[in-house]
Amino acid sequence: YRSCTSWGRISPPNAAPLTMAAPHDLVGELDNSQCWALNTATEHPLANCIAMDKRTGAGVCQSDCDEELLITLTFLQKVRLSGLSIKAPKEGGPSSVKLYANRADAADFDSTKALPVTQELTLSPANTLSAAVVPLLTAKFPSVYKLTILIEANHDDAEETVIEQLAVHGAVNEIVGKRNDNAPKWSEDSGVEKFEKARG
């Protein structure tokens, strides 16, 4: 093997290849116990727009003191994101949306606004009325376990922002094929990658 330490990782032999399933609504991949929002009205919590059993239009998520909302979605496993959709009424639907990938330090409005934005979206009333899936730059969201969503403005400058349904679209990395159990195993020792024989 090459002895220099600047070269990238080489895939081990007989490794199971990774494949990507077709993009879909990732509501089933959310860890609802770790999803939360700031500045939501008590009677209109985040669960109304993300929980699978509450996506019936009976309830909404609504901001409280002003138009801003800070939403954190945590996934059960790492996902590759490809789109975002928000369903909302014409008045009060989100218009300015900033996304932050894998930021554990996005704890409140001030700290989040100080962070670099992963992608910024401007939603039209047509986008939110129809819950259109707005494409994301997948190269910026290849392996996401936490997504922070900052909503700074809404349509018609309404006092509160209203969301009827929030969905992120993408897929989970899936391993297909099976590794040969008798093949040499891949390990690391002091930063130098090497093979070691599989045990009997």
Region locations from a protein language model:
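Extended, solvent-exposed segments with strong compositional bias
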Residues: 111-139
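Detector for Asparagine
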Residues: 14, 32, 39, 48, ...
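Disordered, acidic Ser/Thr/Pro-rich linker "stalks" and the adjacent N-terminal cap
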Residues: 10, 14-74, 187-200
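Aromatic, loop-rich ligand-recognition surfaces of beta-strand-rich domains
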Residues: 58-111, 138-200
